[in-house]
Amino acid sequence: MSATPSQRTVALAGLIGILGALLGGLGECALHYSASGSENAETYRFFVDLAPWRLSTGHFLSIFAIPLYFIGYWHLYERLKPAPQWARLTILLLGLYAFTLGDAWLGSRVYLAQLAQARAVAESAGDTVTIKLLSALLAQACFYNENILIGVRAGVLVISILYVVFVLRGKTSYPRWMAALNPILLVIAAFILYVAIPPIGGIFMPVAMNFAHVVFFSASTALTLRSTPAGQ
C-alpha cells in the first residue's frame, strides 16, 4: 500500500497546477488575443497581424505549460478524498485525457496562423490561384484542429459534473460552496464577462479554460494550505 502524501505535497501539486494554467493562459493569450475580440474568428483574421514573437512565445509557452495540468489534477484527486476511488480516478484520468488533447490542439495552432498569414500575402498580391489553394488548406486544417476541442470540453464537462455531485453530497474534503467553483461554470462565467464587459471579457474569453483552472486550482490550493498543520 502506498503512503498517503503529506498535505504539503498536495499543496505543492496544486501550486504547480496553478502555474501550468497561468503560463498556458499567457501563451494562449499571446496566440489568440486580439483587440477586435472574436471578430472574423472563423476566418482566422486575428492571426494575420500576429507578431512573430507572439507566435513563437505563445506556441512554446503554452505547449510546455499545459502538461503541468496533470499534476494539478493529481492534487484534485487527493483533495477529493474520501470520495469513492472510482470517482476520483475517473476525474484524474479524464483530466489527463482532456489536457493531452488540449496540448495537441494548441500545438497545431501555429500552423493555422502560418496558413492564414500566407493567404493574406496572396490576397495582397492578388494571386487568386494561391488564395484558393490556401483557403482550402486552411479549411481542412481548421476541421482537424477545432474538432479536438470537442474532446477537451466533453472531458471537462464530465469532470465538473462528478466534482459537483460529490462535493455537494459532502463526500470530499471540500466545503460545499466549492461546488460553485467548478471548471465548466467558470468557463461560462468568462463568456458572460465577455458579453457584459467586452474590453475586460475580451482578455479572458480566448483563455477561458485556463482562466477557469487558475481560479479552480487556486481556491483548492488555498484551502489545502489552510488545513496543513504546521511542520507537515
Please place each PLM-identified region on the residue numbering:
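Hydrophobic, aromatic-enriched alpha-helical segments typical of multi-pass transmembrane helices
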Residues: 2-232
